[in-house]
């Protein structure tokens, strides 16, 4: 059976080039449609809203500037993925999920043959020991195989399934 759809999951604020490169490599090798899912969860921002409020309250214009900056970063990540897929001459689509990230990703996995995600994915401001809470929660209820990729891309030499 051939794969029909690979999902590559991205945090648009902390874009993983490794996830992009692994996803493109595998999609090209298997001639599979690649879907870049950008988890634009509205509850997750580059700034810590609670710290802003606690310090001085947040003037509306400052908040709008912070939101605009996040949008630019997320848009640049999606554009980088778009450009890389076009260069690789892949069949691909981009989904910008603006709901709760973990729920959307689990839903996307129902229709995927493979999900690719960075091992350090947290969708938080904090670094966590591996596997992260986000990854552990994702693995509990994913409906397809998951490839958790390292920080740096290296071409795949061999695959061992357990």
Give the label of every model feature segment.
Residues 34, 92-94, 146:
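Generic structural signal for residues in well-ordered beta-strands
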Residues 1, 41-44, 52, 68, ...:
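Structural beta-alpha unit
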Residues 58-75:
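A short acidic, glycine-rich active-site loop
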């Amino acid at each position: 059976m051939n794969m029909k759809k690979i999902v590559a999951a991205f945090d648009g604020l902390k874009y993983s080039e490794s996830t992009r490169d692994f996803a493109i490599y595998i999609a090209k090798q298997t001639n599979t449609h690649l879907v870049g899912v950008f988890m634009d969860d509205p509850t997750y921002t580059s700034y810590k809203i609670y710290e802003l409020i606690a310090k001085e309250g947040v003037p509306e214009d400052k908040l709008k500037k912070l939101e605009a900056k996040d949008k630019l970063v997320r848009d640049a990540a999606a554009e980088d993925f778009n450009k890389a897929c076009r260069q690789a001459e892949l069949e691909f689509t981009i989904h910008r999920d603006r709901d709760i990230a973990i729920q959307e990703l689990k839903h996307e996995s129902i229709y995927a043959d493979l999900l690719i995600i960075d091992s350090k994915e947290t969708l938080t401001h904090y670094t966590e020991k591996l596997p992260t809470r986000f990854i552990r929660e994702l693995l509990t209820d994913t409906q397809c195989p998951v490839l958790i990729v390292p920080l740096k891309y290296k071409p795949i030499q061999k695959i061992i399934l357990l």
